């Protein structure tokens, strides 16, 4: 099973951006975690990150066309991007929304995600381990 692990704006800065919120794991470490977990579970994992919304939309369309499952950290786009939400709604396979921090324990403008309503499930506040848990969930659903 193919799984796209898609990451939105500023996640390429993991390890240096607000380590008190996002931890010290780098983006390269996150990619390795996802790929290693995917290998252990027999998943074909494709990990991508972008700061350009149109690029994320293209990847979501690609996943929809291929019937691939998605682990998505939409980052700031989760709070306001109807375009990202609508692209997620096109997916035919499961979508797990992941946030490294607990968005409900942060500033009020971060409490709502427009993506959550079209996601199969949401994991937040568990650090980068949320990605691993999302991949385990998708593998279990596939069996």
Swiss-Prot record:
Gene3D superfamilies named among the record's database cross-references: Dehydroquinase, class II
UniProt keywords, alphabetically: Amino-acid biosynthesis, Aromatic amino acid biosynthesis, Lyase
Keyword Glycoprotein part of the UniProt annotation: no
Record Pfam families: DHquinase_II (PF01220)
The keyword Repeat is annotated on this UniProt entry: no
Site (Transition state stabilizer): 17
Catalytic activity, EC: 4.2.1.10
Reaction catalyzed: 3-dehydroquinate = 3-dehydroshikimate + H2O
Active site: 22 (proton acceptor), 99 (proton donor)
Pathway(s) served: Metabolic intermediate biosynthesis; chorismate biosynthesis; chorismate from D-erythrose 4-phosphate and phosphoenolpyruvate: step 3/7
Superkingdom assignment: Bacteria
Example GO BP: amino acid biosynthetic process
Binding site for substrate: 73, 79, 86, 100-101, 110
GO molecular function annotations of the record: 3-dehydroquinate dehydratase activity
Enzyme class: lyase
HAMAP family registered for this protein in UniProt: AroQ
Function field: Catalyzes a trans-dehydration via an enolate intermediate.
Subunit annotation: Homododecamer.
Family of the protein in this entry: Belongs to the type-II 3-dehydroquinase family.
Protein name stated in the entry: 3-dehydroquinate dehydratase
Organism expressing this protein natively: Salinispora arenicola (strain CNS-205)
């Amino acid at each position: 099973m193919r799984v796209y692990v898609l990451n939105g704006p500023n996640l390429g800065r993991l390890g240096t951006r607000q380590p008190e919120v996002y931890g010290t794991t780098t983006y390269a470490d996150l990619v390795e975690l996802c790929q290693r977990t995917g290998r252990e579970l027999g998943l074909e994992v494709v990990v991508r990150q972008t700061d350009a919304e149109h690029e994320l939309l293209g990847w979501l369309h690609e996943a929809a066309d291929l019937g691939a499952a998605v682990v998505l950290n939409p980052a700031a786009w989760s709070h306001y991007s109807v375009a990202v939400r609508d692209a997620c709604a096109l997916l035919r396979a499961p979508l797990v929304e992941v946030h490294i921090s607990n968005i409900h324990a942060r500033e009020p403008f971060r409490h709502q995600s427009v993506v959550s309503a079209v996601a199969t499930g949401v994991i937040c506040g568990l650090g980068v381990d949320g990605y691993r848990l999302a991949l385990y969930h998708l593998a279990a659903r596939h069996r």
